[in-house]
From Swiss-Prot:
This is Uncharacterized 36.0 kDa protein in doc-Gp10 intergenic region. It comes from the Viruses. InterPro entries: DUF968. The lineage of its organism: Viruses, Duplodnaviria, Heunggongvirae, Uroviricota, Caudoviricetes.
């Protein structure tokens, strides 16, 4: 037992939550969950079916008194449900009206699970509206959020209904006070920060991989190099313009000089490395370890992200 979230009080008759995800019961979020753009950008039907097979793995029919061992999936209304051969034939002949709630819950729970995974939360974590809005903000999908949800996410009081009739000039609001307008202003202010993020396209079957001896090409990421130059020195910790920090690519005879191998080093540390790399690493640590730690930090703070799923 736990207190009912504040954002659910207006959408519940009592204080009991019987679903796995309390967000699924919020009527204000249904336009967001039913959005075709959201469904497409997080993977579509293929990703949903893969999630169902991984999470459920069994027939989801209403009456499971007898089920076949073979499991298939049925697609309906931008959602899917797992059924055995017996119940798949049954519902194809009689319709899927009995499974409307299951289809909806599968879609909603999948969306919430994707949001939890991308934010690094545990599987048992019950998302709040603020967390869901933050995920939508990171995914650049806040325009899909309804006004009611945006109002709750920024803790804005519901506007009191005004009496109909003539409106006084003093009551005219010269600005848009909707929550969606405020969120849109926040997105516009964060646009320069989004521009610093370096998106990466991933090709699962590149043509060069089929060559016996391919000519390797160095990966160039100018935006990433700008980020590296803005960080403190990995060696002495110097920071600021006076330190003259520049990206230093950790090279190896058998590796290409990719930009992702760069670490921030001041000119003094770079001169010490050129003079005696062994003594520098003995004092400050191995360059290879600095490179791995810095690249892990860059990925963790979102400098390099993959937006391939949003292009589908």
């Amino acid at each position: 037992m736990e207190p009912v979230p504040r954002e659910l009080i207006e959408h519940m008759e009592d204080g009991l939550v019987v679903t796995e995800q309390t967000m699924a019961t919020n009527e204000a979020l249904q336009p967001f969950f039913n959005s075709d753009e959201l469904f497409r950008r997080i993977g579509g039907i293929d990703a949903l079916v893969a999630w169902l097979r991984r999470k459920e793995g069994q027939c989801q029919a209403a009456d499971r008194s007898w089920c076949d061992n073979h499991i298939v999936h049925a697609e309906r209304d931008n959602s899917a449900v797992l059924l055995c051969w017996h119940h798949d034939n049954h519902y194809r002949m009689r319709g899927f009206n009995e499974l409307k709630e299951t289809l909806h819950n599968n879609r909603v729970n999948w969306i919430l699970d994707v949001a939890r995974q991308e934010m690094g939360l545990s599987n048992s974590h019950d998302l709040s509206i603020q967390e869901l809005c933050w995920w939508a903000f990171m995914r650049n999908m806040m325009h899909l959020m309804p006004e009611e949800v945006c109002r709750i996410s920024i803790n804005k009081m519901k506007a009191t209904p005004q009496d109909s009739g003539p409106l006084k000039e003093a009551d005219i609001r010269p600005y848009d006070d909707r929550a969606t307008a405020y969120v849109q202003m926040m997105e516009e202010r964060s646009a320069p920060m989004r521009a610093k993020v370096c998106p990466v396209d991933v090709d699962s079957d590149p043509g060069m991989a089929h060559f016996k001896i391919p000519k390797l090409q160095s990966l160039k990421l100018p935006e990433y190099m700008d980020f590296v130059a803005s960080r403190p020195c990995c060696g002495c910790g110097a920071a600021g313009r006076g330190a003259h920090i520049t990206p230093y690519i950790v090279r190896h005879s058998r590796l290409c000089a990719h930009d992702i191998y760069a670490i921030p080093l001041c000119q003094s540390c770079q001169r010490d490395i050129e003079r005696d790399r062994y003594n520098w690493e003995k004092t400050h640590g191995r360059l290879a370890m600095h490179q791995r730690l810095f690249f892990d930090y860059a990925l963790g703070v979102g400098v390099i992200t993959s937006h391939s799923s949003s292009v589908r």
